[in-house]
Amino acid sequence: MITNLSKVSGLFVIARNSSFAFRGKDTDPRAIASELGVRYLLQGSVRRSAGRIRINAQLLEGSTASHVWADRFEGAAEDVFDLQDRLTEYIVGAIEPSVRRAEINRARRKRPESLDAYDLYLRALPHAHANTPSETDKALHLLGRSIELEPDFVAAHGYAAWCYEQRFLRNGLDLSDKAAALRHADIALGVNSDDPQAMSMGAFVRANLTRDYEGALEVLDQALALNHNSALAFGFSALVSAHSERHERAVEHGHKALRLSPLDDPLNYHPYCALALTHFFAGSFAETVSYATLAIRANPGFSIPHAYLVAGHIGLGKPDAARVAARRLLEVSPAFSVGAYERTELFRPPLMDALTAALRTADLPE
């Protein structure tokens, strides 16, 4: 539902995890709207019984908590996507009558024919978002099963590409992982792909593994044209921009990702990492420390922002703080070494040299 609404031009839609932070809580709708910075709230319930699904939904005006629209939808369980499309159409009509039907049609995307494949994909997401070696393996297992059932499911291929890329970079630079990452990325970026999420992941993976930053940014711009409310796409765009020393774009897109998803902790470490890195390359080391700290808070098990924090403290001339951060980095990733990180070749040599020089100053393993 959130994905479909986000694709409609003219709508600013808060991401799933931020929205769901209030689920099950007795919170005044006006307070929720104020915290998220939105004008309307959509709430409702889904019930399933004897092969039927019933969706009750209501739209509230955030400033007054008054009802704008309410309705109930019912259909067969296998028609859940049709119910979502109908709900999208009604809500868009209630919020902005001038939105054209053609834009509602653009919100309808290709989906896997099998709900089983979709369910496996959904179950893989939290493991992928954790971005640790063990969780990445779990995600790849589920994504592999999903793709077996639905070989053309580009969203699953996008996540598989990302997971294989992460495993390649953080688990010994196994060339088979790199090949798998690029293979899935190519499918995610295929000629029939119009899924902004899959496009964003495929572009990010190719940028990291081939350093074709210009091509990746072109694809990311296409993805954002399809879905201008994608926090994930803006986050990946910020990372690619930081990796390629496009400071202004990295800052702009990093903050845009955070604005779209202010409470989305499982994914906010992406824009925070981008902001930490781009500020390091720009010589703004206090900002590096600040954003690296936020990235660690969002995902403590992800090792890379710990490295950025080390580098930021070195840049500020605080070697003692850098050594504390370095010890924490090794607790999270005992196998981390500066040489192995350098061999990932994530950035062009001048940028990588600056970062690894700072890490070496903190006495991290070579």
Cite the ranges covered by each PLM segment:
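A generic structural signal for well-ordered alpha-helical surface patches
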Residues: 307-308, 324-327, 353
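TPR/TPR-like (Sel1-like) alpha-helical repeat modules
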Residues: 314-337
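Short, well-ordered coil↔helix boundary/capping segments
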Residues: 300, 316-323, 345-349
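Terminal, low-structured helical/coil segments at or just beyond the last alpha-helical repeat
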Residues: 338-366
